[in-house]
Amino acid sequence: MKKILVLGAGRSAVTLIKYLLENSISNNWQVTVADFSIELAERAVANHENGKAIFFNVTDEIQRKSEIENADIVISMLPASLHITVAKDCVSLVKNMVTASYVSPEIADLDEKAKQAGVLLLNEIGLDPGIDHMSAMQVIDEIKENGGDLTSFKSFCGGLVHPDYDNNPWNYKFTWNPRNVVLAGQGTAQYIKQGNYKYIPYTKLFERTELMEVLDAGEFEGYANRDSLGYRYAYGLEDIPTLFRGTLRRKGYCKAWNMFVQLGMTDDTYEVENSENLTYRAFINLFFPYNNELSVEQKFCSYLNLSQDSEEFSKIEWLGIFTDTIVGLKDATPAKILQKICEEKWTLDSEDKDMIVMQHQFEYVQNGEQKKLNSSLLVFGDDPRYTSMAKTVGLPVAIAAKLILTGKIKSTGVKIPTTKNIYIPVLKELEDNGINFVEELV
């Protein structure tokens, strides 16, 4: 019986664990789910005959090494900063490891040791990164093999609320880590356009958006991700003139969110004095010049050059930020207070479903002819637990683990899924599970 160790039973792991347990009998697997919260682990295992839930403390070296040594493969769904600790043990104990997270410099440094040990450390095989890599590389390789020369590659992804449950003026609800949403875009975005390097500072990021339609899901806007440039090398596009990666939101979101950015309310570098006793109204008032003649609403509109009947103002007002609700968070940064305000309005309700939207836009020359191809993905969640986000992060990880255990992926070292031996079988099984791209010449 092959033993699979899953570290972490949080939101991103539920579909992954469900897949492993459902396939455990036919594949003769034992699945151990380890989490600091035994309740989370037990809920994920759900008394399955081939599942086991255990309390796990990643900082307990004796327990960590013991559990890894007993496994045939390790799947780490822990916070990204903890992967390196697990990865070092996997190399020394000769165990393959799979994660959905970006390759950190520390993980990258293990490449040679992993190769010497005959160990595969497969990373970036979730949604973004993960499905984006695999689906992009499949098209890129096909274009190159058919004699095409890529001139532009743009890629966008977003986690949003399902259209049937899109019932607020922002057309947005949290489907993933709320903190990441509030802090999104901080730092300068970098990309390349027609051979020219371009930079967008954070204060301009949400003003510089691209509009697009994705299949029958309607209109979206995309803002730039922090670093698109590294993907030239990851995808073998070193000489491509245009490369851009972005995040998708519904039209109108970015203009309204930019109000918070301009006021400084997404700042996470300092704590607000007496934050726990402030009202939301007093909190937003902190960011305006002193004026005891204007209302907070009037200051907001005056400072940001808006009218009170604008869409941006109505979105901000709907969040309840002008009310006398107490913040109730001690020693909180502006970003943490804003997160709390948003969570009260943007949390998925008990019946809500989410949606993943991804689109790759390729431009290339083939036989002297300029061509454009869009490759688009829509995935819908089942409920607030088995979300489209959990599906698209967890299923590629689970499928890759199965392919490694069955000897169909034989690589060693630190890898991401940009090669055919990985992306072809993973994408095939994702398609069997309803996660498939639609290609359109435009």
PLM feature spans:
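C-terminal catalytic/substrate-binding lobe primarily of soluble NAD(P)-dependent oxidoreductases
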Residues: E145-V442
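Rossmann-fold NAD(P)-binding glycine/threonine-rich loop
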Residues: S101-N123
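Conserved N-terminal Rossmann-fold NAD(P)-binding element of oxidoreductases
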Residues: I4-G8
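N-terminal Rossmann-fold NAD(P) dinucleotide-binding loop
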Residues: A13-V14
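Oxidoreductase and adenylate-handling cofactor-binding alpha/beta cores
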Residues: H133-D149
